[in-house]
Design a protein with these regions (language model features):
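Intrinsic, low-complexity transcriptional activation domains
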Residues: 1-110, 209, 238, 310, ...
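Acidic, Ser/Thr-rich, low-complexity intrinsically disordered regions in fungal proteins
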Residues: 84-87, 92, 99-325, 343-358, ...
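Conserved small-residue packing positions in alpha-helical repeats and bundles
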Residues: 191, 264, 403, 410-412, ...
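Solvent-exposed, amphipathic alpha-helical segments
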Residues: 330-333, 337-351, 476-479
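Alpha-helical scaffold segments that form or flank carboxylate-/histidine-based iron centers
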Residues: 394-404
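Amphipathic alpha-helical packing segments from all-alpha helical-bundle domains
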Residues: 436-442
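Eukaryotic multi-pass alpha-helical transmembrane domains
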Residues: 438, 449, 469-473
Length: 535
């Protein structure tokens, strides 16, 4: 009887909850839901003498995130008047604290999750008009997500927990009964909070609800008074009303793309499919933040899928106005490449068939080329952000740092499959070139993270940055396990940085704890070795 050929998926099925035993058991990083060539050479090797400072990047970035706040305290930001409609103390913190929390939201969260315009939001919450129920729900979401950043002595841990739970329940109850754009904005902001606390069922369910409502309301396609897509007519009856202004139109576009971003970080290292499939989306990329804030209609970049739901569906360029793109635009683009990498790594592969291996390598090189092209097309100085030095940064640069962390994650995700295959054959052997790419990407992120620490920017970065740190640290464990060598001492830096991020994002603390346990067990001599863990 002829034996069946050996088939395996580059990324194997696993329990989504990381354990000490599973953390280095495959070729690509894993989290609870878990987590050419010349283009990124500059991200792999020691920085040149003309390395840029964060200050120089900030000074050259006047067009990006012009209105984002980097205030450390809000005492001088408290307005003289009180809102026309007072807010019950049992539901929300006092008015001055609310103002502080909204200010903190635009400092710590909105720069990398830019779905709201600062001025329009403050006018809505703290203007002379009374606040409507839909806007109050959005305020609840901001409170729930931003309480972690408040140092006000009045907000004891018990009160924070109380306000958080009240706001969470208010949002969920309202969203179930009122499927509208404002409720979706509140859900997306709440998802930032939930996914920053743990990678578990609650976050996945929340993303599923958001993605379904995005499609139901027709927010996954261009359909407004400025741009319109006729490619994918909706069959639903829950169509959102026409946006009244460019800001409203762009807010909806950003709402869809931010759901896409959160879904990628929550899904990318699982065996699951994405909740929001970009192959069915027909959306322009979001524009620069300053254009958004100025209510200035512009065109950006619009790639339309030629065929839906194919594994690597080709796209056609409908619009291309790169001068109107910002950091969030490029973040969405690189996560689109990561989406294709994710699908590629989950395709079954017969490692005994040379023809299958050749086809696999061809796709692998194509995806590598996409990453190269993306990096080369970044605006001038931002392509060298891995060379940041110490200076006086503001929140305007934090989103560009997170953008490059996403690039590092994509590089590791792709190349670790060739560098550290879980199953080998005479035609599918580990690639030394891929190993160097992975280690170079890890070093690049370490340099960026060191600059972030030296300039006091860590609190400005969101939990996706913690995810990238976790991916890089786990790569060092996989390398030690595969090569049967000692663990790189750099892993201590990644663990320490994750512990510091854990002050605001619980998921970072969990990553640090798991890594610490694995390093201790593998280094103790009495437990399993790293190589034994991977087997």
């Amino acid at each position: 009887m002829q034996s069946q050929p050996t088939r395996f998926s580059i990324t194997s099925q696993m329990d989504p909850r990381p354990t000490n035993g599973s953390i280095i058991s495959q070729d690509t990083p894993v989290s609870e839901r878990w987590p050419g060539p010349n283009a990124y050479e500059r991200m792999q090797y020691p920085r040149p003498q003309d390395a840029m400072s964060i200050r120089s990047v900030v000074d050259n970035a006047a067009h990006e995130l012009m209105s984002q706040s980097d205030m450390t305290t809000s005492a001088t930001w408290i307005p003289n008047s009180t809102p026309a409609s007072s807010m019950p103390e049992s539901e929300l913190p006092p008015y001055d604290l609310l103002y502080t929390l909204v200010d903190l939201f635009f400092k710590h969260v909105n720069p990398w999750s830019p779905i709201l315009d600062r001025k329009a939001t403050f006018d809505t919450f703290f203007g002379n008009q009374s606040i409507e129920d839909t806007d109050r729900i959005l305020l609840h979401a901001i409170v729930a997500t931003t309480l972690r950043f408040s140092k006000d002595s009045r907000l004891t841990p018990e009160l924070k927990a109380q306000f958080h739970e009240i706001s969470r329940q208010k949002i969920m109850l309202y969203a179930f009964d009122h499927p509208n754009v404002r409720a979706l904005q509140a859900l997306v902001i709440l998802a930032v909070d939930v996914l920053g606390t743990s990678n578990g069922q609650q976050g996945w369910n929340l993303l599923a609800l958001i993605a379904r409502n995005i499609v139901q309301l027709g927010l996954d396609v261009e359909k407004n008074s400025y741009l319109e897509s006729a490619a994918y007519p909706s069959a639903t009856l829950l169509q959102a009303s026409q946006p009244k202004t460019w800001i409203e139109s762009e807010e909806r576009r950003r709402l869809c793309w931010m759901t896409f971003v959160l879904d990628r970080y929550a899904t990318v290292a699982t065996a699951d499919a994405f909740t929001l499939d970009e192959r069915a989306m027909d959306r322009c990329l979001p524009c620069r933040y300053d254009l958004f804030s100025r209510n200035e209609p512009v065109e950006t970049r619009w790639r339309r899928p030629i065929a839906q739901y194919e594994t690597f569906a080709q796209t056609e360029m409908v619009l291309n106005r790169p001068e109107n793109l910002g950091s969030f635009s490029y973040h969405c683009e690189v996560l689109g490449i990561l989406s294709r990498i994710h699908r590629f790594l989950h395709q079954p592969l017969d490692i005994t068939q040379r023809s299958d291996i050749l086809k696999w390598r061809e796709t692998y090189r194509e995806l590598d080329g996409e990453l190269n092209t993306w990096l080369q097309n970044l605006p001038g100085e931002y392509g060298k952000i891995s060379q940041l030095c110490h200076s006086d940064p503001g929140s305007r640069i934090s989103n560009w740092i997170m953008l490059h962390a996403a690039f590092v994650t994509s590089v590791i995700r792709l190349h670790s499959s060739a560098a550290y295959p879980t199953i080998k054959s005479h035609v599918f052997t580990p690639s030394y070139h891929a190993i160097q790419r992975c280690l170079g990407a890890v070093e690049s992120l370490r340099e960026i993270a060191q600059d972030v620490l030296n300039t006091g920017m860590l609190a400005l970065l969101g939990h996706p940055f913690a995810f990238s740190l976790w991916v890089s640290a786990r790569l060092l464990l996989v390398h030690a396990a595969t090569m049967e060598c000692t663990i790189d001492p750099k892993i201590s830096f990644f663990i320490s940085t994750l512990e510091q991020m854990g002050q605001h994002w619980q998921v970072a603390r969990d990553y640090a704890r798991i890594l610490t346990d694995v390093v201790q067990e593998g280094s103790s001599g009495s437990g399993r070795t790293f190589h034994a863990m991977r087997r």
